[in-house]
From Swiss-Prot:
InterPro entries: FN3_dom (IPR003961), FN3_sf (IPR036116), Ig-like_fold (IPR013783), Interferon/interleukin_rcp_dom (IPR015373), Type-II_Cytokine-TF_Rcpt (IPR050650). Together with IFNAR2, forms the heterodimeric receptor for type I interferons (including interferons alpha, beta, epsilon, omega and kappa). Type I interferon binding activates the JAK-STAT signaling cascade, resulting in transcriptional activation or repression of interferon-regulated genes that encode the effectors of the interferon response. Mechanistically, type I interferon-binding brings the IFNAR1 and IFNAR2 subunits into close proximity with one another, driving their associated Janus kinases (JAKs) (TYK2 bound to IFNAR1 and JAK1 bound to IFNAR2) to cross-phosphorylate one another. Residues 308-357 are annotated as: Disordered. It comes from Oncorhynchus mykiss (Rainbow trout). Keywords: Cell membrane, Cytoplasm, Membrane, Receptor, Repeat, Transmembrane, Transmembrane helix. This is Interferon alpha/beta receptor 1b. The chain crosses the membrane at residues 217-237. Residues 331-342 have a biased composition (Polar residues). One of its GO terms (biological process) is positive regulation of protein phosphorylation.
Amino acid sequence: MLAELPQPQNLTLLTLNTQYVLTWDWDQTTTGNSVSFTVEYMAKYKMKMKKKNWSRVCERTTRTRCDLTGSDLHYLGMYVLRVRASADGVDSDWVNKDFCPDIDASLGPPSRAELAPVGNLLDVTISDPLTSTQHSMKEHVLFLYYRILYWSRSDDPQGLKPKVLDSSNNLVTPPELEAWAWYCVMIQSRYDYYNKTSSYTEPQCMQTEGDTPYGQIFLYFLVSMMVCFLLVLLSSYAFFRFYRGLKNTFYPSIQLPAHIQEYLCDSSPGSDMPRLITADSEAELCCDKLTICPEVVLLEIHVPPPLTAPPSELEQDSGRHIRQDSGDSGIYSTEGGSAQQGRSGGEPIRRDQEVDSWQTLEQVKMEEMGRELADERDLDEGVVDVCV
């Protein structure tokens, strides 16, 4: 005869809105790890029928819990849940538990809460708790309402006394709020028929608004004027710098020297356009050094002896020298010619006149030689580069 298998103990339901999970306890020391469990349910009104038709949810599971959310249990229905253990072909007795979602299921908080300032008030928008199929719980709980706790954040936390506001609406505006103050809000779902209450939502804080003070308006205006002034000043300074740079680039204050401007500008009168490069200027320029040397002329100076009257031979020599020097000076040739003409004409010439004429010619000749020597020194020092 097989030993009896003990039953599961402490059947408990974990619920929230329409989510249901059945849990139980089991002593692992009795059978080890080979035990399995089976969970079934049936509507309670069918228990009086002779033929009972149980719906199986979990079969031979090794876990000590079973999720009934997908069984589509009606929220207002009453059901009987049962669990048994099985090990080595031996089944334990069934353990039953009654379950009514409307009575036993916990109520969840609002799925979402939002705050929005409206003047010196706050609008609180509340979203209903949701079922497992994402529908509102108000479809199952008709008298569902919300309790709203709100308080000023500037209050002393030690002596905090929040104000309470109950409403079944999804949009609530707490009264008697101050302008430009911070308020915090927490919301709870409630169902008084079965005394169901949810947990509160996380605190949310928002600042109220109101009429803008005149001092604040004046401050905004002053700041705006300062910003505009700075923008205009910066724009003007940037434009001035740009204009100055452009002017200095195209119209510099320092002008080029006149000889460079003559080279850059067109040679035609009244033209300010730069002279274009011609084809001749592109040719290669070759320069050679050219030295100009004057022609060397040998001069002869004949000093007559200190005689009171020159002899006849000296008269002839003087005429000859005058004729030789006629190629160098027009004055000499003229004087010499006049002397010859005088002799050829047979006119008598006095000795004292000839001596004076000869001395005058020698003095003129010496002065001409001095000028020529000075010109020779200047020519020797000058060197000119000639482009070929």
